[in-house]
From Swiss-Prot:
PANTHER family: FI07626P-RELATED (PTHR10677:SF3), UBIQUILIN (PTHR10677)
Chain intervals for the UniProt region annotation (Disordered): 88-127, 294-336, 455-475
Record-given protein name: Ubiquitin domain-containing protein DSK2b
Domain STI1 residue range list: 143-184, 197-236, 373-410, 414-449
Name of the coding gene: DSK2B
Residue ranges of domain Ubiquitin-like in the record: 18-93
Function recorded in the entry: Binds and presumably selects ubiquitin-conjugates for destruction. Prefers multiubiquitin chains rather than single ubiquitins, with a binding affinity for 'Lys-48'-linked ubiquitin chains. Acts as a ubiquitin receptor that associates with the 26S proteasomal docking subunit RPN10 for the indirect recognition of ubiquitinated substrates of ubiquitin/26S proteasome-mediated proteolysis (UPP).
UniProt organism field: Arabidopsis thaliana (Mouse-ear cress)
Sorted UniProt keywords: Cytoplasm, Nucleus, Repeat
Compositional bias ranges of the Low complexity kind: 465-475
Domain UBA: 504-548
Record's subcellular location: Nucleus; Cytoplasm
UniProt subunit comment: Interacts with 'Lys-48'-linked polyubiquitin chains via its UBA domain. Interacts with RPN10 via its ubiquitin-like domain. Interacts with PEX2 and PEX12.
A molecular function GO annotation: polyubiquitin modification-dependent protein binding
Length: 551
């Protein structure tokens, strides 16, 4: 044992060797001496010398968390004579790590002034694998605009698109997260989201076959896959053009396409680019952003041409504008400089057809709130307390906060937050501490911070009204707004779209069961009992399973 401890001493360079207990899944126990400053990867090598489990098959679990190779033992709060549970997992497949988000500066093509509410048009991006990239495509606005997974204060969507091009695995990792899987495999939730829009509801009532398409989870997967893979996107465009050409060459084919345009595509465009009397609020029209900036383009042109404004509001005149490419980035922002983008409409050029997927009003289960949210980007305390109980959101947050690399990439995406952290090294160090992040993201702490933010927001509104200047008092608490928008909205979702009480536990906890099996827990019945007892929380289930071993 002493030799093993000595072998880890030169690597850490500081700290003395301490004894750490290892408990295997078969109930056996042994001790290993190592430095707490050593990495988990080197610690696994030491454990492999005292056990028959290779380092690449070890799954080390401490306090319900799986230790990651690139982290130090001290970062997990490990101390002398503490016990680490070890289970044997399958040998991991060799895969290159995800490329870091390579965008330390803002995109030169996007220049926006920092005003009293410059959170408008700032979308979210996925900083790494399993980070629930917030659908990285949420156009955000101040006031009553829809909030996204990470709230306001993250980079522009053009920058997001550039990063996704450099790291195409982001969307793939996002699709593997429990929250996204729950969304795409929940037809009832998708149906309720679609039916929340009166125009879409009327369109689906007239065309039942369209409802089947919109409720098909495979459509979402195909859309996300096309957005992730440029080659697949171009192939789908070619196939669509070829199919349209073939239909047009058939007898009565042109009339068929014309009827499809009049009965389906034009109403769909109207439903996604207009919101009736709601002031073009994306909160009242959850599908307003699916086609990027098409609505902004038409309304921007209408603002300059008063004769066409009444027709645009009624929707009775056929659309004479060319339809946008639903798989490509829209060019609607060409007319955007001519109009003031206030909270009611904060859509940005999207990532292809997913341009505003983050602002869908029905995506409450993914961290978005309704348009009646008082702060626009964070929920109230009672809502947060309820939604944070969702195991998928808890797992997502723990995945984010347990890896400082995610936080570094996330913080580097926003110029304002990055400059604030650069000017305060102590704050940056705190934001890179996993223990602090987990404590900061606890429901109790977030409720206290939200209460403080609400008080500051009310004081700011009062001061701005007294001074006659909008946002006159935003400068002092802008950093708090950024941090709370980033942390508060991370947990502001509960996947509570439908009641899952009648869903069998094998289906309800399919993702969690797969995770437990990958960790080395192969007793499916015992895993289901543990998940039922912990309401689907994988970490708590692991603690329960490990506690029952050897007893």
């Amino acid at each position: 044992m002493g030799g093993e401890g000595d072998s880890s001493q030169p690597q850490s360079g500081e700290g003395e060797a301490v004894a750490v207990n290892i408990r295997c899944s078969n109930g056996t126990k042994f001790s290993v001496k190592t430095s707490l400053d050593s990495t988990v990867e080197s610690f696994k090598e030491l454990v492999a010398q005292s056990s028959d489990v290779p380092a690449n098959q070890q799954r080390l679990i401490y306090k319900g968390r799986i230790l990651k190779d690139d982290q130090t033992l001290l970062s997990y709060g490990l101390q002398a004579d503490h016990t680490i549970h070890m289970v044997r997992g399958s040998a991991p497949s060799s895969a290159p790590p995800p490329a870091p988000a390579a965008s330390q500066t803002t995109a030169p093509s996007v220049t926006r002034g920092v005003g009293s509410d410059n959170s408008s048009n700032l979308g979210g991006a996925s900083p790494g694998e399993s980070l629930f990239p917030g659908l990285g495509f949420n156009p955000l606005g101040g006031g009553n605009a829809m909030s996204g997974l990470f709230g306001a204060g993250l980079p522009d969507l053009v920058q997001t698109q550039q990063q996704l091009a450099q790291n195409p695995n982001m969307i793939r990792d996002m699709m593997n997260t429990p929250a996204i899987q729950n969304l795409m495999n929940n037809p009832e939730f998708m149906r309720s989201m679609i039916m929340n829009n009166p125009q879409m509801r009327e369109l689906v009532d007239r065309n039942p076959e369209l409802g089947h398409v919109l409720n098909d989870p495979s459509i979402l997967r195909q859309t996300l896959e096309a957005a992730r893979n440029p080659e697949l996107m171009r192939e789908m465009m070619r196939n669509t053009d070829r199919a349209m050409s073939n239909i047009e060459s058939m007898p009565e084919g042109f009339n068929m396409l014309r009827r499809m345009y009049e009965n389906v595509q034009e109403p769909l465009m109207n439903a996604t680019t207009m919101s009736g009397n709601a002031g073009n609020n994306t909160g009242s029209n959850p599908f307003a952003a699916l086609l990027g900036n098409q609505g902004v383009t038409t309304q921007g042109s209408d603002a300059s041409n008063n004769s066409s404004t009444p027709n645009a509001g009624t929707g009775t005149i056929p659309n004479a504008n060319p339809l946008p490419n639903p798989w490509g980035a829209t060019g609607g922002q060409t007319t955007a400089p001519g109009r003031t983008n206030v909270g009611g409409d904060a859509r940005s050029p999207g990532l292809g057809g997913l341009g505003g997927l983050g602002s869908l009003g029905g995506l409450g289960g993914l961290g978005m709130l309704g348009a009646d949210s008082p702060l626009g980007a964070t929920p109230d305390a009672s809502q947060l307390s309820q939604l944070l109980q969702n195991p998928a959101i808890s797992q997502m947050m723990q995945s984010v906060f347990s890896n400082p690399q995610y936080m570094n990439q996330l913080m580097s995406l926003n110029p304002q937050l990055r400059s604030m952290l650069d000017s305060n090294p102590q704050l940056r160090e705190m934001m890179q501490n996993p223990d602090f992040l987990r404590q900061f993201s606890s429901p109790e702490m977030m409720q206290q911070m939200m209460t403080l933010q609400q008080s500051l927001s009310q004081n700011r509104n009062t001061a701005s009204q007294d001074a006659g200047q909008t946002g006159a008092a935003t400068g002092n608490n802008g950093g708090l707004d950024l941090l709370m928008n980033m942390f508060g909205s991370l947990g502001a979702g509960g996947l509570s779209g439908t009641n899952q009480s009648n869903v069998p536990p094998e289906e309800r906890y399919a993702t969690q069961l797969q995770q437990l099996q990958e960790m080395g827990f192969y007793d499916r019945a015992e895993n289901i009992r543990a998940l039922l007892a912990t309401n689907g929380n994988v970490n708590a289930a692991v603690e329960r399973l490990l506690g029952s071993i050897g007893q």
